[in-house]
């Protein structure tokens, strides 16, 4: 099969709506021959991530947490800090990653996600 490219324009949309659309396409649920245990031949491109619609309150109050498993290893970061440190597309990557099931195909599916600022 030929690889299909699914393009999403992020301008004016919220992170959750973009991420759910991208996750659905990465899992292959937009094609007629969907099979849950087979990796789909879909590449998802998200464009204009710098124009994503987020409220100022969300930028200051949305907190992403990571825990290393060690004592004192809990790290917290706001959406504003994440955007400043890694770029606007990283919030979309995190949201899509958390919407895709954590199984053996998770990393392969995430490699098919291309985020452009």
Where are these regions (language model features)?
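Ribosome large-subunit tunnel/peptidyl-transferase-proximal elements
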Residues: 1-94, 99-104, 109, 114-117
